[in-house]
């Protein structure tokens, strides 16, 4: 895990196919992926139309509400921890990948070790 500009980036492995960096964001409801990343995942057949689950309205940090297409990631790996069937949402192409509560809340506890720059998942 790397601290970049005050946020922590952690490598995530999607469907055991592609590894990308995500911001650890406990305030995000779901794992969020920019539209261009989702298109890449579709082109590489990492996800397909069968993974899409409809639209949900999300409330952003500024209080505004935005609809977003949801999809399911078959497997998402962070470090040595892999979860299956993780919900994700599509955000504008200019956004970062966020590692949100649809992943984090499935652990009994999680924390960030600032000294070791590590995400601890239990």
Where are these regions (language model features)?
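Pepsin/retropepsin-fold aspartyl endopeptidases
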Residues: 1-122
């Amino acid at each position: 895990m790397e601290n970049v500009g005050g946020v922590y980036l952690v490598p995530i492995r999607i469907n055991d196919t592609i590894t990308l960096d995500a911001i650890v964001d406990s305030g995000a409801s779901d794992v969020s992926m920019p539209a261009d990343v989702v298109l890449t995942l579709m082109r590489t057949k990492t996800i397909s139309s069968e993974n899409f689950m409809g639209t949900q309205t999300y409330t952003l940090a500024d209080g505004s509400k935005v609809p977003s297409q949801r999809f399911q990631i078959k497997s998402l790996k962070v470090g040595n921890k892999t979860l299956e069937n993780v919900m994700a949402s599509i955000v504008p192409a200019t956004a970062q990948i966020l590692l949100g509560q649809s992943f984090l809340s499935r652990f009994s506890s999680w924390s960030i070790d600032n000294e070791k720059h590590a995400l601890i998942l239990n």
